[in-house]
Amino acid sequence: MSAPRESLLELVDYVLGRLXLGFPVDFFPAGLIALNKTPQTIVFYKPYGVLCQFTDNSAHPRPTLKDYINLPDLYPVGRLDQDSEGLLLLTSNGKLQHRLAHREFAHQRTYFAQVEGSPTDEDLEPLRRGITFADYPTRPAIAKIITEPDFPPRNPPIRYRASIPTSWLSITLTEGRNRQVRRMTAAVGFPTLRLVRVQIQVTGRSPQQGKGKSAATWCLTLEGLSPGQWRPLTPWEENFCQQLLTGNPNGPWQKKFGDRR
């Protein structure tokens, strides 16, 4: 490749700190790599039954993100299972995706889970301590019993069993492993029937800063959205993301925009 090695590495570092498969890049004759189009980020309320991808090559195609979002080059920040609902960020900025999704940054993700049975507060203690599965141990979660939230009816509805009641839990994680909430509730004897991600709380603090220092916080919710709807980021959110990537999430912009918890 004829481009200077330093220039190439600098640009790859800008994309993600590593080259991310699936992200839009252009290869010019000179060998330089450039991002295709201005990075864009949106907030989406994923409905039940929708795949967290834009294509489905199965024999019987299922609903995908493409049925709701007609924007190019977007990729989910983390995933929601097909049978899960709620808050999903999508971005064309690979570095931002890494900063928001990687477990090392320990951003909080809150889920409301409708479970089978009537757990007590004591039943939730294993979730708070962390559960060790055969393939990994979970981090301690924030878990509590809540009243039934006011969500739109699910289509199709969950299958009720007349002899078994259901309850709602709020579970907050600082990691996002495959089907983690469902595995955790099943492990303590209360299988999840419906799962909705309701909040993502992003802190500007890096792991190296430690817990003792204050940091700007971006608390993202489903407010203003119905299932299947999406919105672009607000100016405040755009500024937060920009400063998050430059390593100065508590810079001068904080005085202007404040801490939107």
Curated annotation (Swiss-Prot):
GO BP: pseudouridine synthesis; rRNA processing
Q: Which residues form the active site?
A: D81
Task: Identify the keywords attached in UniProt to this record, alphabetized.
Answer: Isomerase, RNA-binding
What organism does the record attribute this protein to? Answer: Synechocystis sp. (strain ATCC 27184 / PCC 6803 / Kazusa)
Q: Which GO terms describe its molecular function?
A: catalytic activity, acting on RNA; pseudouridine synthase activity; RNA binding
Q: Does the keyword Chaperone apply?
A: no
Q: Name one Pfam family in it.
A: PseudoU_synth_2
Q: Which PROSITE patterns match?
A: PSI_RSU
Which protein, by its recorded name, is this? Uncharacterized RNA pseudouridine synthase slr0612
